[in-house]
Amino acid sequence: MSLSSLFNGKYDTKFLLNMSSAAKVELIVEKVAALADACLETPLPTDWFRNILDPELEFNSNFEEIHSIGDEEFAQPLPFLPFRVLLITGTAGAGKTSSIQTLAANSDCLITATTSIAAQNLSGLLNRTKSAQVKTIFKTFGFNSSHVSMNERISCSVTTLDSIADQQKHDLSTYWNVIADIAERALNAANGKTKVIPDLCESSVIVIDEAGVILRHILHTVVFFYWFYNGLHKTQLYKNRVIPCIVCVGSPTQSGALISSFNPLTQNKDVKKGFDILSALICDDILSNYCKISENWVIFVNNKRCTDVEFGEFLKHIEFGLPLKPELIEYVDRFVRPATYIRNPTNEIGMTRLFLSHYEVKSYFKVLHEQVELTNKDNLFTFPVYFIIQNKAFEDYKNEISNFTLEIEPWFKTNLHRLNTYSQFADQDLSKTIQIEEIVLDDGSVEETLITCHLKHIKHSSIGVTSRTKSSTVGFSGTYEKFVELLQSDLFIEKTACEYSVHAYSFLTGLMYGGMYSFCLSEFTTSEVMTEIRKIKLPNIDFLQTMTAEVSLQTFDESDEYYDLHIAPTDEEMLASDPCPDPFFLKYKQLPLTNVLTFEEISYLYTVFKEIFISRFAILQRHSKEMFGKSNLITYNRNNVSSKRCGEICSHVKSFYGMLTYAVPANNYTLEGYTYDNVIFLGTDKMLPPIIYKRGLPKIVIKDEMGFISILDNNVSKLTDTVNGNSFHICTTIDYAIVSKVAMTVTKSQGLSIQRVALDFGNDPKNLKLSSIYVGMSRVVDPNNLIMNLNPLRLNYENDNIIASHIVKALKNKDTMLIF
């Protein structure tokens, strides 16, 4: 008997599953509180953190590249740094995030994540303000861009590690180049006048979301910096000898941590699979016994996002490593479609294609773009991407690596994957031909080399951003019904941090002001409709009569809006030639600037315009038998805007005025077009050389899932390579920080919930792994939205689920907390 039949359909299955697990989720708080009560019986050695011997010397006395912290003459061996761990695991959609929300709401803890996407997703779920955004665990302990090129050590001296203390030192030694650099900087900063207290001094409870994608040594790194920072700043936590409790959250069966390294001497990269934190906590006997994982493990069992019984049963068999019955293998046959059908871009346009390799993704994009170019060329955008090479830094870099014959072009092609987010250039249809030219300054000197490539994207395709990107929200595109729903629910206001609510009210007021005249132009508007519209009460707003539109630009800050109203014709001038003038614009001729109004005045203006807008909507709905609400509304903030066939979006006053916001990787966006017009307060322009603008640098226009239109700031990133302790800023990349979601690798899709998926495993897949099958198929919530080119379970595949047997053992353990 199913849950839904038990309750006669009164409650849906998702609701029942969530409610049934709520009580146990609250018990996690008690579990964490108990672990966080532990304290050291005896203190750590006095000032141990000021002079620390390189731990590699304890395993290999002949080690030459010693990097001790502090004064090497007084350096002492690192003492063992104790810690506690609570492990929280479960499949996709099982409720792990709800446990983090409960911990954040009911305990004093530091919430972090392993990736920027996970961190920003948590920030949204926890409704964090801009000043309290969830950070990545790397940023939390002090990692920055200069550490990216610091390779991890590969120790060959240790064969067996018999104690947790030895294991801790060995893991710290692996990452010691980064640890020592961060610690040295912290010691120097502590001697300065201004002291910034690190986040790790806030609480002894540290939550790490998506812990399965980072290597095991990061666990000991977090423990090290907890004790290091608290000791350095003499916090109450350190004085009370409070032992940290690390809460590791993730899915060990679908995770995979990678070790990547780059050898500047050979210009070769190496990527291989590593041992992640979750796998180490579960499989490593020494670590598992020390942390008492058998007692401190919480497992979420049921996938609450997917309530299809058969599909959930199938995923559970793979998750827990249960034998696959013949009927389950036959069940997967229903998803199979011909490979030619899936690979044809004209079929299943709304589906995201998932492939096993970057090469297959890139090949699909090439076919797709060729087809779009033939059928509708205006829908294919080609955007330039620029790379500025610093000539002197490049020459110094060549000398440092003793590769004197290295040229810019081969270096560029070899290092393309390092110049920006790897998958952005590995997956996308980036032009093979590159243009290389020297940038000649006014005095005739040449200091930089410019490399130009081109990326292709499709209009109205699904995209994401590669990092948190500054944007200006300037408009709305959707149905009248959707816009009115947003106004009535105050959803946009609620999603805006409270300190910026005044700008949210002003922005929505500007959208209503810009969209008000569209009621007069609707195909459903008749003389009777206009008569009723004229009868709508238009209150007198005294401050609108006294406000002046002239405000000096010097009085603005980055969060203010700027409306260059004197450039555009006034509404009174536009209405003078209108045979059917709109009484709204005759009454309210100008909309004042945000920074000359009080919050009370802006909120009053918003309330008045909202009542007028909704009243007009109700009139049109009634006269059109509710057909008007389905029609499209496109409105921009106090601006008239037009769109060209080629996709360029133009403001009639050559500027866009919007609300400063941020696009984040956790969200989905639609590519609307691009613009060359000025966008107030997107300040990348000042950072770039004039030659970039002469070549052409558009700004990307996107639409979010609610329908709000934003213009993205251009993305500027720098590649700094570190060799022998010396840093070289070699290249600056100027692009758009966007990546297509039309197709991607299965690995990249991990952690994403995708509406509709078409899986392509290739014609004869080699090295097919069960984890890839699981990740690809579990992206969908509804199995009716999944198709595949073959049934991978009928092929030879590697069962790489080494965790499954441990999970099954834990399920039988009475001390494991199971949450269904």
Curated annotation (Swiss-Prot):
GO terms for molecular function: ATP binding; ATP hydrolysis activity; helicase activity. It comes from the Viruses. Associates with the primase and the primase-associated factor to form the helicase-primase complex. One of its GO terms (cellular component) is host cell nucleus. Component of the helicase/primase complex. Unwinds the DNA at the replication forks and generates single-stranded DNA for both leading and lagging strand synthesis. The primase synthesizes short RNA primers on the lagging strand that the polymerase elongates using dNTPs. Possesses helicase-like motifs and therefore may act as the helicase subunit of the complex. Belongs to the herpesviridae helicase family. Keywords: ATP-binding, DNA replication, Helicase, Host nucleus, Hydrolase, Nucleotide-binding. This is DNA replication helicase. Gene3D superfamilies: P-loop containing nucleotide triphosphate hydrolases. It is found in: Host nucleus. GO terms for biological process: DNA replication. The keyword Nucleotide-binding applies. Its EC number is 3.6.4.-. It is an enzyme of class 3 (hydrolase). ATP binds at residues 90-97. The keyword Cell membrane does not apply.
